[in-house]
Regions:
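Acidic/histidine-enriched, glycine/proline-rich intrinsically disordered or flexible terminal extensions
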Residues: 206-225
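GST-like domain detector, emphasizing the conserved glutathione-binding G-site
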Residues: 1-151, 218-224
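GST superfamily/GST-like fold recognition
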Residues: 152-176, 180-189, 194
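A late-sequence structural motif
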Residues: 197, 202-203
Length: 225
């Protein structure tokens, strides 16, 4: 890659959003420089690229982009092979709806449940997270009953948007008993297939890594801000 098209990804190993974009870059077979950001001591150049001070952030051909969902669509448009979004505009819309559900609903509750310090509310949070997971499971069945991916036989940006959070689920199970309900069999089958993808295997972390890194989230709400 020439200097004019050099690609840099600002990331943090622990971050599920950055994990998404790393998966897409690997799926595309793209060359890029990985810049690990200390989230407790963010470098000035990173803050110049990422207006929100969050990872991931991408620099490519003079363009600075942040927010994982936006970065991933950019990558799929600029580097169209292999395509990670369906050609059917109706399915593309469904993919975006479910990615928005992940970012705007599922994850906000997921992290709130992890940071909850009131044991009297644990059961209510568990019910809420289980409801999210069952909704996701049903959404997978509705879009592609046989899978193995969200939208059918091929992986898409939708799969890579969700997978990093499921890889981190052991931390939620460890601290708040928030695991995958037994009846979410569509998700279980999807996870098995996703875990075997070379891109996923290349950057996977063991459960103990996430349990250790998410301890501060589970300890107290203020510590995780």
């Amino acid at each position: 890659m020439s200097d004019t098209t050099k690609m840099e990804l600002f990331t943090a190993r622990v971050c599920p959003y950055a994990h998404r974009t790393r998966l897409v870059l690997l799926e595309k077979g793209l060359d890029f420089e990985l810049i690990e950001v200390d989230l407790q001591n963010k470098p000035e150049r990173f803050l110049q690229v990422s207006a929100y001070g969050k990872v991931p952030a991408l620099v490519h051909d003079g363009v600075e982009i942040y927010e994982s969902a936006i970065i991933n669509e950019y990558l799929d448009e600029v580097f169209p092979e292999p395509s990670l979004m369906p050609r059917d505009p109706r399915l593309r819309a469904q993919a975006r709806i479910w990615i928005d559900y992940c970012d705007g609903h599922f994850l906000s509750d997921h992290y709130a449940a992890l940071k909850n310090q009131d044991q009297a509310k644990n059961a209510a949070w568990k019910d809420k997270i289980d409801a999210h997971l069952r909704r996701i499971d049903q959404g997978m069945r509705d879009l592609s009953p046989d899978g193995p991916y969200w939208l059918g036989p091929s992986a898409s940006l939708l799969d890579f948007a969700y997978y990093p959070f499921f890889e981190r689920l052991p931390a939620w199970a460890h601290y708040r008993d928030l695991g995958l309900p037994d009846d979410c069999t569509r998700i279980r089958g999807w996870l098995t297939v996703m875990a075997e993808r070379p891109s996923v295997r290349a950057i996977a972390n063991p459960p103990d890594y996430y349990i250790e890194r998410y301890a501060r989230y589970a300890a107290a709400p203020a510590a995780a801000e």
